[in-house]
């Protein structure tokens, strides 16, 4: 009897690592699935007309100190040009977003099991922040030339750089905001990862609502 119990116990112990490995694999797969779902949803929402311009949460506005200059321009009959500049900034961001898809997917696929386990029990946007750390710079390099192409079509773009450069010299705006292309690229990235984070939070809070058995299994018990 004791021998039988010993054999049974040994068998159960042998199965434990397998169960743990399966659980870890599910965890990593769940994180990947959540990121992919969030990335696709965010890119779909932002990478279309008015994706940025029509959403107050991600709409790209002029930097704080330049808003006063914009009001002055509007008072002197240049309001239409200011509006054209802001619209161009947002259209540039909308045009750039589709370029992020391939990099986002590649980053998701490269996530290790250990990475998944570390962020599974993190905050509502912990996966997105890990993701952002891995992809923000390369996505920015993809965005920049598209933004440059769009802003060149606007007459106020050069004037923005001149005025913003002076404002940065006086410490009125951040140095990185003094170039319109860099500014729009940065804000476009901020908006993209904000939307991905919101999608991740939704999945964590309501995994059943995703319709995915895997996401329900991984996030349902958190």
Put a short name on every predicted segment.
Residues 3-21:
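N-terminal export signals
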Residues 22-88, 93:
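N-terminal Sec/ER secretory leader and immediately downstream segment
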Residues 28, 32-36, 40-41, 125-128, ...:
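Short N-proximal segments of mature Sec-exported proteins
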Residues 33-44, 83, 98, 102, ...:
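Hydrophobic alpha-helical segments involved in membrane association or supramolecular assembly
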Residues 42, 112, 207:
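Residue-level signature of catalytic and energy-coupling elements of molecular machines
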Residues 83-150:
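Mid-length scaffold segments of soluble, non-membrane domains
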Residues 146-192:
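An amphipathic alpha-helical core segment
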Residues 191-222:
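A cross-kingdom marker for long, charged
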């Amino acid at each position: 009897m004791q021998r039988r119990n010993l054999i049974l116990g040994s068998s159960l112990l042998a199965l434990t690592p397998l169960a743990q490995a399966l659980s870890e694999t599910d965890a990593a797969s769940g994180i990947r699935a959540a990121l992919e779902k969030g990335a696709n949803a965010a890119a779909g929402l932002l990478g279309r007309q008015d994706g940025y311009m029509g959403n107050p949460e991600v709409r790209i506005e002029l930097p704080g100190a330049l808003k006063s200059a914009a009001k002055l321009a509007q008072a002197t009959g240049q309001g239409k040009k200011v509006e054209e500049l802001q619209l161009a900034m947002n259209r540039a961001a909308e045009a750039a977003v589709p370029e992020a898809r391939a990099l986002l997917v590649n980053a998701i696929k490269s996530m290790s099991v250990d990475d998944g386990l570390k962020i599974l029990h993190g905050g509502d946007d912990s996966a997105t922040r890990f993701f952002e750390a891995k992809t923000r710079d390369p996505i920015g390099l993809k965005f920049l030339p598209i933004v440059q192409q769009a802003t060149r079509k606007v007459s106020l773009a050069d004037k923005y750089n001149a005025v913003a450069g002076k404002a940065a010299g006086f410490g009125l705006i951040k140095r990185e905001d003094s170039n319109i292309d860099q500014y729009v690229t940065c804000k476009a990235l901020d908006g993209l990862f904000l939307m991905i984070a919101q999608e991740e939070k939704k999945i964590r809070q309501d995994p059943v609502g995703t319709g995915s058995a895997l996401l329900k299994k991984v996030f349902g018990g958190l």
